[in-house]
A protein has these predicted regions:
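Active-site proximal loop and beta-alpha junction motif in alpha/beta enzyme cores
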Residues: 1-24, 30-237
């Protein structure tokens, strides 16, 4: 975090993984804003962050000693091509029957993630990918990771995130992927959609013993996606 170069921004943020810089990271944003508020550096809401992808609004609210952070994302984009079912099954080491038959697509509200609907949480929890093949497919289809997921009830989902050559094989919390997933669910009407905010709860990291919960929201206006955001909170260690 540093001084902004844009006059309309409060703080400039850059994000780094072990192997490279990345343009956007939601859990780092939630954690950073939490730290700024706790230390008294950030005293008003909202604030505007300068990122590699442009300016980004962040709202925060103190609630029962917990800081709730809401990070605006961008309008969704959709990749026109995706790996074949055969390629996905080879990379995830699953049978085709483990897929629901729903759309498989790379979606982005800041960074592209390949969204893959699976039939059960048991299948999700037991995934042991072929990472070299997975990374190769990410390169070929211009996406930054695989995000297999299972749709539960009441807008609850379970997911895992396997990033492309990040320096680690799996991520316990991926807000950019959760935001893309929420937009995907609304676009393809995989859930009941209403005008106004459509709110989703995504559980991630359980299979790796680092559980997290991410709140992803999509605002629909005149049956079109008008806004996306991620909500969450962090603990200071």
């Amino acid at each position: 975090m540093m001084k902004p170069t844009q006059a309309d921004c409060d703080i400039k943020v850059r994000y780094f993984m072990p192997l490279h810089e990345t343009d956007m990271c939601m859990h780092a944003t939630v954690g950073s804003v939490t730290a700024l508020v706790r230390r008294g550096i950030c005293q008003t809401s909202p604030i505007t962050l300068e990122t590699n992808l442009g300016s980004m609004r962040v709202d925060w609210e103190m609630r029962d000693e917990q800081i709730d952070v809401a990070v605006e994302q961008f309008l969704p984009q959709y990749q026109p091509t995706a790996p074949t079912v055969s390629e996905i099954c080879q990379a995830l080491r699953i049978a085709p029957e483990a897929l629901t038959g729903g759309p498989i697509q790379s979606v982005s509200t800041s960074r592209f993630k390949l969204l893959i609907p699976l039939i059960s949480k048991a299948v999700l929890d037991h995934l042991v990918p072929d990472f070299e093949l997975l990374w190769s497919l990410c390169d070929r289809y211009e996406t930054t990771g695989f995000y297999p997921f299972v749709l539960g009830t009441d807008h609850v989902l379970y997911a895992r995130q396997f990033p492309k050559r990040a320096g680690y094989d799996e991520d316990p919390a991926t807000g950019v992927a959760a935001s893309a997933l929420a937009a995907y669910l609304v676009k393809y009407r995989q859930v009941t959609v209403q005008n106004g905010w459509n709110c989703f709860t995504i559980f991630q990291g359980e299979a790796m013993g680092q559980p997290s919960v991410i709140y992803a929201d999509v605002f629909v206006e005149e049956n079109k996606i008008a806004r996306t955001r991620i909500r969450g909170n962090a603990k200071m260690l």
